Amino acid sequence: TDCLVLIGSHLGENMHNGQVQEVSTAIERNATIITVDPRLSTIASKSKYWLPIKPATDLALLLSWIHVLIYEDIYDKKYIEQYAIGFEQLKDHVKNMTPEWAYGISTIQPDVIRKTAREMANASPSVIVHPGRHVAWYGDDSQRERAIAILNALLGSWGKRGGFYFKEAVKVPSYPHPKYPHPHWSWKDNLDGKYPLSAMGITTELLKASIPEFDYKHQIKAWIVAGTNFPLTIPNKELFQLAAESVDFIAVVDTMPMDITGYADVILPECTYLERYDTIRSAPHREPNIALRMPAVEPKWESKPSWWIAKQLGERLGLGSYFDYDDFSEVLDWQLKQMGTSLDEMQKIGIKIFPRKSGPLYLGDGEEYSFNTNSGKIELY
């Protein structure tokens, strides 16, 4: 890409090594980096533009960028005409959302908003406005993500070289475990239709279900907490504290002492990713691929891999028949053999690349394409 916009992302301070390497390459060839972050993060310090935005006001900035692209007539007209609908409604919607309007909300100067919008337009379609990771912390974050998607559409980025390529993943076959019984209830049963679009458990609702005063249909009496540090990840500390005091029992699975382990009745020490096998990695990418995470050294002291912890608990709860293997490597070897490889081969090569089956990475000039929407178009409004 020639222009990368990071809003809700702090590459360089997390474990996404592949992305960091690619961003480093982009910096070396003088790609423009625009970083929106209240603090001077690592990537902000490497950026051409750092926009120290007021927290929780991203949406105002995004809408003003959209306004500039449309009303300065610097969006990708040809792309929008072919692949999008709802442009006139969008144009009317953002009419008054000027950089001056956004400045009063976001504290970003109007001239900086205009300058950065023009940088994006100049790089179009080789521009990416990164959607961020784990960004749903505020009430309007779904709309925030929509605004980012709309911005990328106006820049002609979807399906274009230097923008967003069409990704593809390899399907990993499921190991033939015995069929699990259906749970008597799930977290959704407590919500009475709230949050219908949520596909995963809503942590704050699980905490509320642990507190008798909320009078939820299904009360939670115990927690097994794995891979999360509630005291630092739940914005409402008071809610967490009350929930932790309300449950009868807390078990924590973690690789090291954390804030949450101080609340545990029992701690089950998990070994680190360098000491265990994990499930086969198959993520959407340019080239479909699978990756094997395997142990480099034996686990230290009493720590164990998560599969071992789950299997031991299952056996003690009378559920041992659902863990019909002695070692998780048996599961991995079976799955890999269905995919034309084996655990032995993957231990040697680490990553295996497969041929694409879904077509080219990018749209050709003027190529017909149907997006995964009701209309088959990018729906701007």
Set out the residue ranges of the language-model regions.
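Surface-exposed loop and adjacent secondary-structure segments within mature catalytic domains
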Residues: 173, 178-186
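Cofactor-pocket helix-loop regions in the catalytic cores of large enzyme subunits
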Residues: 1-169, 190-296, 300-369, 376
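Short, intrinsically disordered, charge-balanced linker/junction segments flanking boundaries
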Residues: 375-381
